[in-house]
Amino acid sequence: MTNIIELPEVLANQIAAGEVVERPASVVKELVENAIDAKSSQITVEIEESGLKMIQVTDNGEGMSHEDLPLSLRRHATSKIKSQSDLFRIRTLGFRGEALPSVASISKITIKTATKEVTHGSLLIATGGEIETLEAISTPTGTKIKVENLFYNTPARLKYMKSLQAELAHIVDVVNRLSLAHPEVAFTLISDGRQLTQTSGTGDLRQAIAGIYGLNTTKKMLVISNADLDFEVSGYVSLPELTRANRNYMTILVNGRYIKNFLLNRAILDGYGSKLMVGRFPIVVIDIQIDPYLADVNVHPTKQEVRISKERELMALISTAISESLKEQDLIPDALENLAKSSTRHFSKPEQTQLPLQSRGLYYDPQKNDFFVKESAVSEKIPETDFYFGAVDNSVKVEKAELLPHSEEVIGPSSVKHASRPQNTFTETDHPNLDLKNRQKLSQMLTRLENEEQSVFPELDYFGQMHGTYLFAQGKDGLFIIDQHAAQERVKYEYYRDKIGEVDSSLQQLLVPYLFEFSGSDFINLQEKMALLNEVGIFLEVYGHNTFILREHPIWMKEEEIASGVYEMCDMLLLTNEVSIKTYRAELAIMMSCKRSIKANHSLDDYSARNLLLQLAQCQNPYNCPHGRPVLINFSKADMEKMFRRIQENHTSLRELGKY
């Protein structure tokens, strides 16, 4: 009797489903890709309970014949390849014939389909991979597939599902990627009767980007294009000022297929060069057209890993396309806009970019307890122009996005203010990059900060500054050199730590509320984590498509910090999966202290420098910044005398050494 048997087809399909169907988003991906391969121009995705209860995908594609319909549930049955040679010139998204039978084996599936050549369509109902009904019906041309009770016969998979909001965010991300890959298709995503995503299907990639990431983001995207004999590279990349805290906003498409490729990600970052801050990543949508012979998509059942021949040449092509596009842009006006934002409430741009040849110092305002740029340092008149409704400076040659038709009420400039994300204002040398995903390292840092004891700070007399970075002071113990960024980071950390920790019901009403735009998946994830934001005094309300509105802010947050501060808080939440309120408050204090501190290469006047040293002396631990770096170093009088050889290491005379 043989011990080796051929597994039943249903069991084999359930095993295959372990790789193909990881979560509800995997089902959406496979069904939508089949609809795209069927040459659909309209695809509607409807889900209930984040896809665990029901997923329905409706398209207006070619449909299936009555004879082909039952074959579609057979393993490795496909219409997309016929011979071995076809495997090397695949242009469809699917070809393995595994997805539909795998999905059918772990759910109840209902398929209605019809082709334009016949007068009637077909209905198929199957449960657990077993066909229960196959009959002729009247239905429009195209296919409608409904998947119900997903994972009903694989309870272990259900056990490891994340929350409904997290699973929904994955589905939104899948639909967004597919809509970017195929802007010629009109996508609609509906969850529990609520529309989450809708694209126009005009074929304009820029419009698709605007529909997903918002108009404000699209205005800061640059078009790129490059080609050689093997590859054609096109798409859009964000200006260096517009970045995110992770790679989730980097979309690479190969022949209409979203892929993950570390080397191509590296090529994108190389194209930006030193314009990107460490730990920040651009928003990118890059479409690569390639001969199928040069790409092997038959690597993994999910088909997200692709092996590409001449990968080094492709990397160089991408890097060159991005760097050349950035070279054409005059980035100076955006830097000046940053300066204007720090001194005026309105979002504005200067009329000209030439600055007077005089020192631009930082000064201290004791009433606001903060540093500021003296207004006389910039003598040009700055017209007040609303950020959203005003004209964009022509010196930044960025293609303007076409305004998409929107069903919502048009909001005037006097009713709300569109918040803009923080721009990169410090360098890698200011502080080590704070890795929010390294929970062990963060835990050690927070433990160290919690156990700090009160320190005694020496009395210092400030007398100068070097390179706009280091302060010089003298005390009874000798010379002290202070890192101004680390010093104010410590001062700000203890301020935010106390203020965020004692959040109460005291909120300041905003005369003009702020609007905050997010991508669909981030918008959903933030709704799930909103309680943490509420604990630190930030109350965001849903306001239209992928948008929150902020009507009030905690009294400890300065109004000029609201736009960048709230975005930074949200980005921080999105990077952490599970975090306690105590930990979030502590991490938030570290992040905000660094973002709000003066940076290197900024001159301080004498009053501001002395005031910084006074604030530092009042800190619980004035000797280290929150990251653990030293705030100051000391050269004693004896150290100085040794360096200048005013005293010898020992008492041996020069005559005894034979010098004289």
UniProtKB/Swiss-Prot annotation:
It comes from the Bacteria. This is DNA mismatch repair protein MutL. Keywords: DNA damage, DNA repair. Pfam families: DNA_mis_repair (PF01119), HATPase_c_3 (PF13589), MutL_C (PF08676). Coiled coil: none annotated. Gene3D superfamilies: 3.30.230.10, Histidine kinase-like ATPase, C-terminal domain, MutL, C-terminal domain, dimerisation subdomain, MutL, C-terminal domain, regulatory subdomain. GO terms for biological process: mismatch repair. PANTHER family: DNA MISMATCH REPAIR PROTEIN MLH, PMS, MUTL (PTHR10073), DNA MISMATCH REPAIR PROTEIN MLH1 (PTHR10073:SF12). Belongs to the DNA mismatch repair MutL/HexB family. One of its GO terms (cellular component) is mismatch repair complex. CDD domains: HATPase_MutL-MLH-PMS-like, MutL_Trans. This protein is involved in the repair of mismatches in DNA. It is required for dam-dependent methyl-directed DNA mismatch repair. May act as a 'molecular matchmaker', a protein that promotes the formation of a stable complex between two or more DNA-binding proteins in an ATP-dependent manner without itself being part of a final effector complex. GO terms for molecular function: ATP binding; ATP hydrolysis activity; ATP-dependent DNA damage sensor activity; mismatched DNA binding. PROSITE patterns: DNA_MISMATCH_REPAIR_1.
